[in-house]
Design a protein with these regions (language model features):
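Acidic, low-complexity intrinsically disordered tails
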Residues: 371, 377, 593-636
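N-terminal pre-triad scaffold of radical SAM enzymes
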Residues: 25-28, 289-316, 341, 349
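Conserved SAM/AdoMet-binding glycine-rich loop
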Residues: 24, 55, 59-60, 339-487, ...
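Glycine-rich beta-alpha loop elements in corrinoid/cobalamin-binding modules
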Residues: 37, 56-251, 258-259
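Amphipathic alpha-helical packing elements
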Residues: 158-170, 560-604
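Conserved, mostly hydrophobic/aromatic
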Residues: 165, 273, 308, 333, ...
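Flexible glycine/acidic-rich beta-alpha junction loops that bind and position SAM and/or redox cofactors
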Residues: 84-93, 141-143, 173-178, 203-206, ...
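Terminal amphipathic helices with adjacent charged low-complexity linkers/tails
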Residues: 61, 190-238, 262-265, 292, ...
Length: 636
């Protein structure tokens, strides 16, 4: 049986070690599961013979907390964890969140803001010359100069502010092994400038071969057009086959150099990574706190792929995992599934089989495997490329094998399907089997908006494509003799969304007959195309000027429009309708969003009625849900 990696000096000594090779410092609790980057990288290093100690969520107020193992032989590895620490701590409205799913018992406050910078500087206070290598999503998406939403300014590469030596960006397996081998052979960290998938600092460009010179930090900080230009260059250099080396000047501080991305893992390499001896659980020291909430959903889920060629503008995957699909073999996934069924808490349900996009199981075209993805076109947007290979046969086969396993009652697909890709496949077997076997009443899909103007900036297919998918999904349900519904996710205040577009979305929600309980407001996180548009007001790939709803008040209005029935939102909804010139939606008609303010008899009070208020003196109207709404529509 696997044992957890050392988290204390005693653990280290119990293994007979005098010193660890690497100390991995992470902002997450220690969960030894393949869905956690800390576990993958540390287990991979262990498999190559390196000794790794883990310091999960050290007390950043005490430098002693970083030194529990003493000085590592080769270096410190630093990550904020599975999530960016600022996204983890703050809502899009910049309010403190109440729960941290990656901490014991969901407790908030066990990691600092900007965890990577804080941890790195903490290390430097004690270990002045020990190599420090950054990894994980926080460091990866801040590897070059970037707009920071929380401070509303352009910030340095995280390599500058952290005092670290290297960034291993992206998924990191290839680069971390190459870095470890270089350090182990005695190469100074300052000389490790050749590893794909890394970022390093240098004084000048004399040893950098044919770099692409990005606008300097001073330029992108002062000029939004320069920022957009820099982002466009970086966006077009995210493919390991075609990307160049990029250099960003920091004046007297020298340069930050980004090497091309590491090559994607082969299927054999993917299988090896997921076959490492993970315990599959959180460390027992968290038992007293009730465990780690983030593990609950993924404990009985299976990762089948990495990468995504969907290229949604608001998603960071292009910068982090890349557009080239990488998959595990059926044998690897089935082996993990069988092991999962033997867990004492397994109830017969596999919660998910997927990745960034569940139904991607092969590269979008054969060209990707040898020449990379196209620099100046997308695979699915605005329409599927003529070279796209849309085929679900492999995924269908995998799901069938999983359904047939002993002890498995049902296999869910919850990580989301790309509905335009489903439609691009002429074979309807996947959609039919998805409806029949892998949905439980509701299928969550992400059309994001209904305005084609907004969808264009989002990099999403037109609304007509989504409506076609709904019709096909309905056919699949009828064929299976089931009554199931698609539950859409929508996003408010994305760049390009004027108040008129927001009202258009509210009208669509009205016609659906339900009110979303939660609304996803666009969150400008580092290194997404949408964030570049948000900050600059420019589409970086076209140079087009883009309207941006920026103020907290306007964002609140757009969010309120999607929840217009909530009485608390009435004034915001009314203001939004006035701005959009849509006062026709204030009244008593069936299509109206809110009723006008009505003066009560006998005094000066006003009644503020949100929604259409179909209730009467005999009682309130029944609550409208997706299920009863569809039932009523069918009865008409």
């Amino acid at each position: 049986m696997s044992q957890f990696l050392p988290v204390t000096k005693k653990d280290m000594e119990d293994r007979g070690w005098d010193q660890v090779d690497f100390v991995y410092v992470t902002g997450d609790a220690y969960v030894d599961h393949s869905s956690f980057g800390t576990a993958i990288i540390s287990r991979l290093l262990e498999s190559r013979g390196y000794k790794v100690g883990i310091i999960p969520q050290p007390d950043w107020r005490r430098k002693e907390s970083i030194a529990i193992f003493g000085e590592p032989r080769l270096g410190f590895l630093v990550s904020a964890g599975n999530m960016d620490s600022m996204v983890n701590h703050y809502t899009v409205a910049k309010k403190h969140r109440q729960k941290d799913s990656y901490s014991p018992g969901g407790k908030m406050g066990l990691r600092p803001d900007r965890a990577v910078i804080v941890y790195s500087n903490l290390i430097r206070q004690t270990f002045k010359k020990t190599p420090v290598i950054l990894g994980g999503i926080e460091a990866s998406l801040r590897r070059m100069a970037h707009y920071d939403y929380w401070e509303n300014k352009v910030k340095h590469s995280i390599l500058i502010d952290s005092g670290a030596d290297l960034i291993s960006y992206g998924m990191g397996e290839h680069s971390i092994i190459e870095i470890a081998e270089a350090l182990d052979s005695g190469i100074p960290v300052s000389e490790i400038t050749y590893v794909a998938g890394t970022v390093y600092k240098c004084r000048d460009l004399s040893r950098t071969y044919e770099p692409i010179i990005l606008p300097s930090f001073d330029e992108v900080q002062a000029d939004k057009l320069a920022y957009a230009r820099s982002f466009a260059i970086q966006y077009q250099n995210t493919d390991p086959f075609t990307a160049g080396t990029m250099a960003e000047s920091y004046g007297t501080k020298g340069y930050v150099i980004q090497n091309p991305p590491a090559l994607p893992l082969t299927q054999e390499e993917m299988d090896d990574v997921y076959d490492l001896p993970y315990v599959g659980n959180y460390h027992p020291m968290y038992e007293k706190d009730g465990g780690i909430p983030a593990l609950e959903e993924i404990k009985f889920s299976l990762t089948s792929n990495r990468g995504c060629f969907g290229s949604c503008s608001f998603c960071a995957l292009t910068f982090h995992q890349g557009r080239i699909l990488q998959t595990r073999s059926h044998e690897s996934i089935l082996k993990e599934a069988v092991h999962m069924t033997e867990e004492k808490n397994f109830k017969g349900y596999i919660h998910d089989v997927g990745g960034p996009t569940a139904d991607f199981r092969q590269p979008s075209c054969q060209k990707q495997l040898t020449r990379g993805v196209c620099k100046n076109r997308h695979c699915l947007f605005p329409e599927p490329c003529k070279n796209l290979t849309a085929d679900h046969k492999d995924y269908v086969s995998l799901l069938r094998k999983l359904r047939d396993l002993p002890k498995v009652k049902k296999v869910f697909v919850r990580s989301g399907v790309r509905f335009d890709y489903v439609l691009a496949d002429p074979d309807k077997t996947f959609l039919n089997e998805l409806a029949k076997y892998h949905v439980s009443g509701q299928l969550r899909v992400a059309p994001e908006h209904v305005s084609n103007q907004v969808l264009k900036y989002m990099g999403k297919p037109s609304h007509e494509v989504y409506e076609k998918f709904l019709r096909e999904f309905d056919k699949a349900n009828k064929k299976a003799g089931l009554q199931q519904f698609a539950v859409p996710y929508f996003m408010s205040s994305h760049p390009g969304c004027t108040m008129k577009e927001a009202v258009k979305l509210a009208e669509y929600v009205r016609d659906l007959g339900f009110t979303p309980e939660q609304v996803q407001d666009f969150y400008p996180t580092p290194s997404t195309l949408s964030t570049c548009m948000y900050y600059t007001g420019i589409h970086p790939l076209t140079g087009e000027k883009v309207y941006v709803p920026k103020s907290a008040h306007e964002k609140a209005i757009q969010r309120a429009l999607m929840q217009y029935k909530n009485p608390v939102n009435r004034e915001l909804v009314l203001e939004g309708l006035k701005i959009a010139g849509r006062m026709d939606l204030v009244g008593y008609g069936e299509k109206c969003l809110i009723r006008p303010v009505r003066k009560e008899h006998g005094d000066n009070k006003y009644t503020e009625n949100a929604g259409r208020n179909r209730g009467s003196k005999h009682g309130p109207a029944p609550k409208k849900t997706i299920r009863n709404h569809h039932t009523r529509k069918k009865q008409k």
